[in-house]
């Protein structure tokens, strides 16, 4: 569960290393974001020659959470970190590579580009 002020790692090669959630999109009083939800983020740490700079505000999709996701068959998948993938204005990934596993729930959310770039889909 990601909320305002949550710090997330970045799971792509857009140049950002660490971001902070500044808004959970989808409703005026929505508090938490789960895997597959879109959030607004501020870049807190970035690599020198990346596509994004420190202080930039971007859209991102949550791909891994410590809280995890519960499936209809009763199984649950949790991760060791909270991670997001940076998106542009058209909700397409900024980076060209995705690092680490992503879940099948992203396939339902129309993020097939992220699913196809990911090295592992759980």
Swiss-Prot record:
CDD domains: Ribosomal_uL14 (cd00337). Keywords: Ribonucleoprotein, Ribosomal protein, RNA-binding, rRNA-binding. Pfam families: Ribosomal_L14. The keyword rRNA-binding applies. The keyword Ribonucleoprotein applies. One of its GO terms (biological process) is translation. One of its GO terms (molecular function) is structural constituent of ribosome. One of its GO terms (cellular component) is cytosolic large ribosomal subunit. Belongs to the universal ribosomal protein uL14 family. Binds to 23S rRNA. Forms part of two intersubunit bridges in the 70S ribosome. Part of the 50S ribosomal subunit. Forms a cluster with proteins L3 and L19. In the 70S ribosome, L14 and L19 interact and together make contacts with the 16S rRNA in bridges B5 and B8. This is Large ribosomal subunit protein uL14. The lineage of its organism: Bacteria, Pseudomonadati, Pseudomonadota, Gammaproteobacteria, Alteromonadales. The gene is rplN.
């Amino acid at each position: 569960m990601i909320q305002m002020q949550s710090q997330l790692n970045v799971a792509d090669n857009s140049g950002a290393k660490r971001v902070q959630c500044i808004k959970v999109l989808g409703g005026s009083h929505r508090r938490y974001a789960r895997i597959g939800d879109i959030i607004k983020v501020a870049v807190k740490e970035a690599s020198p020659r990346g596509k994004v700079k420190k202080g930039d505000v971007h859209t991102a999709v949550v791909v891994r959470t410590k809280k995890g996701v519960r499936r209809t068959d009763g199984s649950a998948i949790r991760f060791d970190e909270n991670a997001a993938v940076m998106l542009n204005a058209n909700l397409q990934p900024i980076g060209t590579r995705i690092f680490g596993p992503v879940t099948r729930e992203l396939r339902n959310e129309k993020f097939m580009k992220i699913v196809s770039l990911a090295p592992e889909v759980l």
